[in-house]
A protein has these predicted regions:
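Non-catalytic pre-domain segments flanking phosphatase-related domains
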Residues: 1-22, 49
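Mg2+-dependent phosphoryl-transfer enzymes with acidic/Ser/Thr/Gly-rich catalytic loops
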Residues: 10, 14-19, 191-273
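Short, hinge-like loop/turn segments at secondary-structure boundaries
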Residues: 71-75, 94-95, 131-136, 200, ...
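Short, structured coil segments at secondary-structure junctions
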Residues: 71-72, 80, 175-178, 231-232, ...
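Short hydrophobic/aromatic-enriched beta-strand-loop microsegments
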Residues: 73-81, 94, 137, 181-184, ...
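Conserved acidic, metal-coordinating active-site core of Asp-based
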Residues: 107, 111-231, 240
């Protein structure tokens, strides 16, 4: 974890903050929950009042991203950053190459694993299993098995999701050229474009707003948040974060169940008392 030699160095860095990126599951929201805590809501609203932009950076597709009453995010980075919007403007759009989509589906079939694919507007699957069902249940959604699955394969696919254990991860990308794993759960994976990721998307959002890396901070907990935390001036790991995330973080706050974001922002004078 990065350390600061004195309080003035930390204070100067915090005073630069103009934009903050938040993961959802395990960061803004406790796993399996649908609503943020009152303190988290208070923190987000206070940041907006103080002129700091707030953004979601999540592995979730757009249609599964929850809206929180009274909170308006300035930008949303969905599909682990493969599709980003700032207000009504598309800032980044990076689908998985068609040949890789088809190869991954072929690999999954050989592994006897159903897959779910996400376009900008829809999520459809060619089947379901316990791991995929439980994965979707974390976001309080159901797997949508569609007879029109093959039609959606021909559209822009921004993310592929499937149940997949650690051993199976070695094989799911065989034969692909421009796809990579973005995993944050041990029983399933997200697959995104190789040039995608939350970190790449954050760079594009910062360019859109004409902010520097040093003017941004981010909060995350999963391994798919690592590049995000390294793409900002100060990446903060949640207390409940994976050890790999804590190792690269500039700082660590309390866990999501203990209102870690609220108390951290309060301690850094980024939100009002």
């Amino acid at each position: 974890m990065r350390t600061y030699e004195n309080k003035d160095e930390l204070k100067n860095e915090i005073n630069k903050v103009k934009i903050i990126f938040f993961d959802i599951d395990g960061t803004l929201l406790e796993m399996g929950k649908t609503e943020i805590t009152p303190n988290t809501r208070k923190a987000l609203c206070s940041l907006k009042q103080n002129g700091i932009k707030i953004c979601i950076a999540t592995g979730r597709p757009f249609v599964t991203i929850p809206m929180f009453e009274g909170v308006v995010f300035d930008a949303i980075l969905a599909f682990n950053g493969s599709f980003c919007v700032a207000g009504e403007q598309v800032v980044a759009k990076c689908p998985i190459p068609k040949e890789d989509v088809k190869k991954i589906i072929e690999n999954a079939k050989r592994m006897e694993r159903p897959v779910s694919i996400a376009t900008a507007e829809e999520i459809v699957a060619n089947g379901s299993d316990k791991d995929l069902e439980d994965y979707f249940a974390l976001a309080h959604h159901r797997v949508n098995v569609s007879e029109k699955f093959e039609e959606y394969v021909e559209k822009d696919v921004f993310q592929i999701m499937l149940g997949c254990d650690l051993e199976e991860r070695k094989y799911i990308l065989e034969g692909t050229k421009n796809a990579k794993l973005a995993a944050w759960w041990d029983r399933a994976v997200d697959i995104i474009p190789k040039e995608g990721g939350k970190g790449t998307a954050i760079e594009q959002v910062l360019a859109h707003y004409k902010f520097s890396k040093e003017e941004a901070i981010a909060f995350g907990d999963g391994e798919n948040d690592i590049d995000m935390l390294l793409s900002v001036g100060k990446g903060i790991a949640m207390g409940n974060a994976a050890e790999k995330v804590k190792e690269i973080a500039a700082d660590i706050c309390e866990s999501v169940t203990d209102d870690g974001i609220y108390y951290y922002l309060k301690s850094q004078k980024l939100i009002n008392e």
